[in-house]
Amino acid sequence: IRWKGQFMGKEEFKNPHPELPVREPILKLGKMITDRVPIKLGFEKLTADSPEYWGLAPICTDEQANIALKMGVRKPKTLKQMVQITGMDEKELEKQLEQMSFNGLLEYNWENPQHEKQYVLPMFVPGSAEFTNMNSTVLEEHPEMGRFFERMSRLPLEKITPMVPPGGAGIGMHVIPVEKAIDMNNEAISLEKISYWLDKYDGKYAASPCSCRKSRKTYDEGCADDPEDWCIAVGDMADYVVETGKGGHYITKEEALEIFKKAEDNGFVHQITNIDGQDKIFAICNCNVNVCYALRTSQLFNTPNMSRSAYVAKVTKENCVACGKCVEYCPAGAVKLGQKLFT
């Protein structure tokens, strides 16, 4: 697979608005959120040409950046807690937090004993890079967000992919199979099954746009897929994508199954998010190998653990006629065709 995005000239990824003054709060926030090890350790300086800067600048005021800097990354805080740490007026602060959520800088959920709404500053990927691309209003006004998503799905992983253990360790995505293609006597663990997750989040689903497909279109790459409705948000994330302009709409379990069937008919890959342990996800994606950044990154760096399944491809040699169809269709490159032999 030739991932064209990797061959773009460096000028494609510089600050699209060099005429604007550099904003210190944005630099600080970009450094706090980024997963890029050289920047975290101080070996590389974050500048206005860094995607962490020019990806945040269009969607975040200096005041909002200072609010986010007090939150910490992936540390949920209720509105009352935010009032305490910022000292801001509650109504004004709530207005800012809701705007930050609409723009995709923040997400929110109700995952606490009191079931009280809490705001979260997410990672770039998975996180704000996807959310900004899902929001058509933001993406139309700031098409550079498409390139921002591409950069942040690759740059942080360039140095660490060889160290990713089986299962991904919370990095990348986790492939789940089309259940009807798996022998039901197989000792598959339940988290591998779409049905497990649909039952776990019963009644809380929202179909939303694919951020990878939308991102690619901003720089004229990808495929001809309609980006709408391929990402199935579950749980509190379903409310988030519906309420914050991310193109989400609530669907039934039957409608979700119809989307998965349509994805299977198109040869797409079911993937679940992989950052919150084995018993929590926030979405089931239906990924096209031609545009999916998670699949791209795992194959580009030869790190299949990043998009690993609990299943292993095996060939029944006596039945194989070396037609090559399985090689053509497998998005993870799990089988190869040699001299009339499959491995």
Predicted regions, residues:
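Long, low-complexity, charged/polar intrinsically disordered regions in eukaryotic proteins
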Residues: 3-53
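Short helix-coil-helix linker/hinge
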Residues: 58-65
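Short acidic, hydrophobic short linear motifs in intrinsically disordered regions
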Residues: 74-86
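Ferredoxin-like iron-sulfur electron-transfer modules
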Residues: 88, 119-121, 272-279, 283, ...
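A short, conserved structural fragment
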Residues: 101-112, 335-336
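Short, amphipathic alpha-helical interaction segments positioned at domain boundaries
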Residues: 114-156
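Catalytic cores of enzyme domains
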Residues: 155-312
